[in-house]
Each structure stands twice: as structure tokens, then as C-alpha cells.
Amino acid sequence: MPKARAKKSEQTRRYDKNVIKAAQFDISPRDFSRNALNVVEKLQRQGFEAYIVGGCIRDLLLGKKPKDFDVATNARPEQIQNIFQRQCRLVGRRFRLAHIMFGRDIIEVATFRANHSDARNENQAKQSNEGMLLRDNVYGTIEQDAARRDFTVNALYYNPQDNTLRDYFEGIKDLKAGKLRLIGDPVTRYQEDPVRMLRSIRFMAKLDMFLEKPSEQPIRELAPLLKNIPPARLFDESLKLLQAGQGVKTYRLLRQYGLFEQLFPALSAYFTEKEDSFAERMIVTALTSTDERVADKLRINPAFLFAAFFWYPLREKVEILKNEGGLNNHDAYALAGNEVLDLFCRALAAPRRHTAVIRDIWFLQLQLLKRTGSAPMRTMEHPKFRAGFDLLAMRAEIEGGETIELAKWWHEYQFSNGEQREQLIQEQQRLHPKPKKKYYRPRRRKTTCSAE
């Protein structure tokens, strides 16, 4: 009996060591989403453990305003559904989650996970030959759940009931040091989910942190494992990486660790030692523009970003088809567009709504060459004209020469009145008159007279 009491006392001491008063970091329930607090409170009233978890706590500790609030609990998905009824929707097969709906606001609730080696059957956990977790639904305790998190700075739990934090892997200490550290063996954790390599880059750029050496070293060697990730998931991850406001910084890090070519293998042929090819300069120019738009809280369109990324590979393919296949400009663009988008979507499965816009932006580059007659007004009426013009302006910055003159003309045309526009068109017609059609005299048909 005394032995059991001693064991319990040891657990209590270990537990208390990991429980920290949130008030010392100026954190209180008012910093959290009302809906997330309601979910935690309802689960706790039903006798379950429940905490607000992960990135929102990390962001609050860094003085940032969180965007999302997630909850972790020891309630199973079916139990969560019984509590929240029609307000709850269960999602995911690989990683079973509950979404609690508050109108347009969704609170994601996950059941505490244990090590997948504790699984009793393949319905709970399953791994591929490369070590990737195909299913991860082994449930456990809060301590086990913390060990399943990716980085120490994300393994933080908040209990609004007593305003305390739980930190099992010194995440707060790492956060103060600006250090990203994987929980567990880095090789194993990257093999379990190769997307963790991309998450490490995203957090380095977003949080301005460094990746500790043991977590950093395996990335370049394990980068090819990203080929095992479904292209649709990689597309979503690419948006998180490149459209969060740190696109240029993220791109540099992805190149540094050999990850960019895994996401965009069709672009790797255009990489140079000095990183100064037209394609590389376009990537940086497009990402700089995206970062500025995010900072200004303007709308961003992923289709524009990828249309810019693949513009020079498209141009190269167009010239090949024209020179070797004898195709006209329009047909060469259509066929080249199909081939380039096919290569893009093999790695990142972009939805059709995006690929359709990418095509529009590319074809507008042809239309922008037409500056006489009624063509300019028809081009300006195209729904994607502004995106097409923005790509032209970026090309002018990179290519110089005639492209600068073309971009200037269209800038002036957009902001001119009717009379000024007509003058601009007439000037173009004077500079580039249509060749006169040659008049061919019809030949007289020869008639053959039969001899009588």
C-alpha cells in the first residue's frame, strides 16, 4: 500500500511541474474564442478532460492574435457527437476529428492520441513501407497526446477553468529561445508525416525561429518522401506556405532545404546557381507582390501566383511547338498550357477553378499584344484583365525592352478617357499599319473547243 501511495505522489509532482499559471504570461479566458471556451466548458461538464491546444497558445505567448482555436479532449469522437448532436460533424479517416459548428465558425476537436505502436488493429493505426502513418486513431492520455504533437511549441494546453497551461516538453522555454524542436526522433517523425518538413519551414518563416540541428539535418535527405503525399494535400500546404505573408522568405528556405523542387519539380530545370534566371526572378517578383497584398489586407488569388510561376516554362514550350510543330501562336499556347498544367497538377492537384483562371491569365498575354481597332476594349472587359495586366507588368520588370513599352501603353489606356484611348489606338495603327491585301487578278479559265 505505501508503495502505491509513493507512485501516486511521484505522478502528482511530475504533473504539477508541467502545470503553469497562465496569468504570469498575461493570458486569461478573455483572450480565447467564446465558441472554443463553450466547447471546453460543455465537455468538462460532461465529466471529460478538455483543453484549448496548440498554435493559438503559442501565438498568444508571442503576443500575436490567434486565428484559429482548437480543442483536445479525452472524449472519443462518437462521445463528442453525442454531446453536441447536430452541431457536430465527424471528419477524417486517417485522423478522426470532430468539427463543432457555430454558424461559419468551426471549432476543431481532437481526441487525445497515444503512440501508434499501441494500436490493437489496422483500424486504429496503419503505416506504409516508408514509415508514413496512413491511419492514426489510437487514443490515450494528455501526456501521450503531447508526445504525439509535432513541435514542442505546439504541445501546449490551456485550461480556462483554472487559467493554467500544461507544458510537457519545455515548449515555453523553446519559444523564448526562438527554437523549433521536434518531439521525438526527427527521422521517425518526418517519416510518419513528411508534411512536417513543410510545417517546419512555415513556422521558421512565420515565427522568425530557427530549427534546432537534430530537427534540421534529415530534411534534405528525406525531402523525396513528399512524393508519397496526395497532390491535393500538397496543394493546400503550398497555399499555407506561400500565401501567409512571408512568401519570399519561405521560398528561400524551401530552396535551402531542397523542398521547393519536390513541390514544383517542373520548375527545377530553370534553377541557376545565381538564382537569376527569368523563371527564378518571376517567382520572387510574384511572391513579393503577394506578401505586399497580404500586408495591405488585399485579396489574393493562388491562380495568379501559379500563372506567374509557370509563365516562362510555358513560353519555352510555346516556342518549341511553333518551331518544331509548325503551330500558330494560339494553338501553341493552348497545347503548351495543357502540358505545363499537367506537370503542375501531377505534383500539386490544383482545383479546376484555379487552372481555368491560370489559362485565362496566360491567354490574356496574347490579347494584350493587340492594340488596334476594338481589341483593346474587348480585352479590358475580360473578367481577369487586371490579373493579366499585373502579370504583364511583372514581365516588363524582368524582361525590359518592348515589354516595358507594352505595359506602359496598357497602363495609360486603362486610366484614359474615351478620346485619349482613341488617340492611343490611332497612334498604334500609324506605327503598325495593317499590311495591304494584295489584289490578285482572277485568271481567265481556259476553254477547250472541240473540233467540229
Swiss-Prot record:
The active site is at residues 68, 70, 150. One of its GO terms (molecular function) is RNA binding. It is an enzyme of class 2 (transferase). Residues 431-452 have a biased composition (Basic residues). InterPro entries: NT_sf (IPR043519), PolA_pol_head_dom (IPR002646), PolA_pol_I (IPR010206), PolyA_pol_arg_C_dom (IPR025866), PolyA_RNA-bd (IPR032828), tRNA_ntf/polyA_polymerase_I (IPR052191). Its EC number is 2.7.7.19. Residues 427-452 are annotated as: Disordered. Coiled coil: none annotated. Keywords: ATP-binding, mRNA processing, Nucleotide-binding, RNA-binding, Transcription, Transferase. Pfam families: PolyA_pol, PolyA_pol_arg_C, PolyA_pol_RNAbd. It catalyses: RNA(n) + ATP = RNA(n)-3'-adenine ribonucleotide + diphosphate. GO terms for biological process: mRNA processing; polyadenylation-dependent RNA catabolic process. Adds poly(A) tail to the 3' end of many RNAs, which usually targets these RNAs for decay. Plays a significant role in the global control of gene expression, through influencing the rate of transcript degradation, and in the general RNA quality control. Belongs to the tRNA nucleotidyltransferase/poly(A) polymerase family. This is Poly(A) polymerase I. It comes from Haemophilus influenzae (strain ATCC 51907 / DSM 11121 / KW20 / Rd). The lineage of its organism: Bacteria, Pseudomonadati, Pseudomonadota, Gammaproteobacteria, Pasteurellales.
